[in-house]
Regions:
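Solvent-exposed loop and beta-edge segments used for protein-protein assembly and interaction
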Residues: 60-62, 78, 125-127
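Alpha-helical scaffold elements adjacent to nucleotide-binding pockets in ATP/GTP-utilizing enzyme cores
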Residues: 13-21, 35, 100-104, 143-147, ...
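Conserved catalytic-core segments of large NTP-driven translation/proteostasis enzymes
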Residues: 52, 66-70, 78, 82-90
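Long, charged, helix-rich clamp/arm modules that form nucleic acid-engaging surfaces
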Residues: 40, 81, 90-94, 114-235
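Conserved helix-loop functional segments at active or binding sites
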Residues: 20, 24, 107-114, 150
Length: 235
């Protein structure tokens, strides 16, 4: 079967992009991406292959490489350990992915592949992600990061397939195609909606015009009604 996979975006940027396209429908993908900066994942993270985004939006297909965002917290006292803190994660890790990642990191520590890590704790809460790795003195932080990206889901890919139904058939659309189809859909729906409203208002207008006409010759109408034998004659 076929399934669509469109990354989430910032709503404000999406609206601005639609408005820009309405004003200048000849805009190319690169120009549109000056307004729509790219995907905006709710879990944050780093897009490691930003240079490939124009091609992805031009074709409607591709893979976005996501990396966790890490920060180094230096110990405040000599006895304190430095920490490597994960504050944002790839979108693909939401849900059970965090626990799986913690388990994978623990396995790497146990197998001595992350020998410079002495403790792992998940301090995440409703305020955000916070996974803390306590480090040995003089730990090679860059090496630790590279191992984490290579051996765990802290680096992952999001497959893009901007598939949509157009004219009753599935079609992979690029960014301009999505914008055009969205605006065509809105135009068609709103035209149909306001046509129905217009017809209802025209019916009301005819009734009101009839009442106004009746008021202008009310005496004649009363005389006709009084002189009629029944409702059929009155009509």
């Amino acid at each position: 079967g076929m399934s669509t996979s469109i990354p989430p975006h910032n709503l404000g940027e999406v609206i601005d992009t639609v408005m820009a396209y309405i004003d200048q429908p000849e805009m190319e993908t690169e120009a549109l991406l000056s307004v729509l900066k790219g995907p905006d994942f709710p879990t944050g993270g780093i897009i490691a292959n930003k240079s490939e985004l124009p091609a992805i939006y031009e074709t409607g297909m591709g893979r976005i490489k996501l990396r966790a965002r890490m920060e180094v917290e230096l110990g405040k006292r000599r006895s304190d350990r430095d920490k490597l803190v994960i504050t944002e994660i790839p979108y693909t890790m939401i849900g059970a992915g965090i626990n799986k990642c913690l388990s994978d990191i623990a396995d790497l520590v146990e197998s001595k592949k992350l020998a410079d890590v002495v403790d792992i704790s998940n301090q995440s809460n409703k305020e955000g992600i916070r996974i803390v790795l306590e480090l040995k003195k003089d730990a090679d932080i860059e090496k630790i990061q590279n191992i984490l990206y290579k051996k765990t889901k802290l680096e992952d890919t999001f497959g893009v397939n901007m598939l949509a139904i157009t004219n009753g058939r599935p079609e992979t659309l690029n960014l301009k195609g999505i914008l055009k189809n969205y605006l065509d859909f809105q135009y068609e729906n709103n035209t149909r909606k306001y046509q129905v409203l217009l017809e209802k208002e025209q019916e009301k207008k005819e009734i009101k015009e009839g009442l106004i006409t009746a008021c202008d010759c009310i005496d004649l109408i009363i005389a006709i009604l009084r002189g009629s034998k029944n409702l059929k004659d009155a009509k």
